[in-house]
């Protein structure tokens, strides 16, 4: 049996739920509400990686979560970013205030959607 025949009987995967968070400046960050088991294990393993400082380890964990969970980022007055490369690039370019807001949003999101994971 060919690949096409096998795929016909399969249902499409449902979209993961999403949650939107709005900053005081009006930016909207949309985060995915589902994470695979492999991603959860990868995130847990980050806690055991030797880093130069506690700050380095914290930054790695925040960036990892952002990369895996960010779906869309609407910045005031611009087209929304939806491509993974664009989202990560903009995160790396973010100001200290934007990073603080993102960290707080990730903590809130983890508490609501992934209470079993340790927030950075």
Q: Where on the chain are the PLM-derived regions?
A:
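Short Lys/Arg-rich cationic patches that frequently serve as NLS/NoLS or arginine-rich RNA/DNA-binding motifs
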Residues: 1-14
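Short acidic-hydrophobic surface loop/beta-edge motif
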Residues: 14-26
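Short N-terminal binding/cap micro-motifs at the start of the first secondary-structure element
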Residues: 29
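Short, surface-exposed, charged amphipathic helix/loop patches that serve as local interaction elements
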Residues: 32-120
């Amino acid at each position: 049996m060919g690949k096409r025949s096998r795929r016909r009987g399969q249902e499409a995967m449902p979209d993961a739920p999403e949650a939107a968070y709005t900053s005081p400046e009006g930016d909207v960050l949309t985060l995915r509400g589902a994470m695979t088991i492999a991603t959860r294990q990868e995130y847990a393993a980050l806690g055991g990686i030797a880093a130069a400082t506690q700050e380095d380890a914290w930054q790695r964990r925040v960036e990892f979560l952002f990369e895996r969970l960010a779906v869309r980022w609407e910045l005031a007055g611009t087209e929304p970013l939806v491509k993974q490369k664009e989202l990560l690039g903009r995160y790396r370019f973010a100001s200290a205030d934007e990073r603080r807001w993102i960290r707080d949003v990730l903590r809130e999101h983890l508490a609501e959607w992934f209470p079993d994971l340790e927030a950075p």
